[in-house]
Amino acid sequence: MGKSILLINGPNLNLLGTREPHIYGNTTLADVEASCKAHAESLGATLATFQSNHEGAIIDRIQAARGNVDGIIINPGAFTHTSVAIRDALLGVGIPFIELHVSNVHAREPWRHHSYFSDKAAGIIVGLGVYGYKVAVEHVALNFKERAAL
């Protein structure tokens, strides 16, 4: 059985490809998701995707992953700087996660420099554009441990 990966994208990431392309590029979220699924499959893993602009929906999806997913890749979007609740959900399910940002948040506004996730993430990918998603999928597929069989 291959690894199971959950890719979560937070607020406004549904606008990838059209929102501030000078920062986020021209690739759509649908293209990112399709590319990530194909890459995961090429590595013997499966990948499920989820995007929401709502904090509670993201928390619900994280909680639903408990016992079903080997690793989470999360681009929390603006929730990076505000959501203790999503952080608590990630810690509560005990699934290792990668924090991902398309842009280099440390080269942007000072308020974007703080993350509620970075100190607990297994890894952080910042500023690689949408290529960062491929890097994250590969890392989880090749390096995270599979959950124990029940």
Swiss-Prot record:
Q: Which reaction does it catalyse?
A: 3-dehydroquinate = 3-dehydroshikimate + H2O
Report the active site residues.
Y24, H101
Q: Which positions in this protein are listed as binding substrate?
A: N75, H81, D88, V102, S103, R112
Specify the pathway: Aromatic compound metabolism; 3,4-dihydroxybenzoate biosynthesis; 3,4-dihydroxybenzoate from 3-dehydroquinate: step 1/2
Q: What are the recorded GO MF terms, alphabetically?
A: 3-dehydroquinate dehydratase activity
Biological process GO terms, please? 3,4-dihydroxybenzoate biosynthetic process; quinate catabolic process
EC numbers listed for it are 4.2.1.10
Q: How does it assemble?
A: Homododecamer. Adopts a ring-like structure, composed of an arrangement of two hexameric rings stacked on top of one another.
NCBIfam families on file: aroQ (TIGR01088), PRK05395.1-1 (NF003804), PRK05395.1-2 (NF003805), PRK05395.1-3 (NF003806), PRK05395.1-4 (NF003807)
Which family is this protein grouped under?
Answer: Belongs to the type-II 3-dehydroquinase family.
Protein name, entry field: Catabolic 3-dehydroquinase 1
Q: Which gene underlies this protein?
A: qutE1
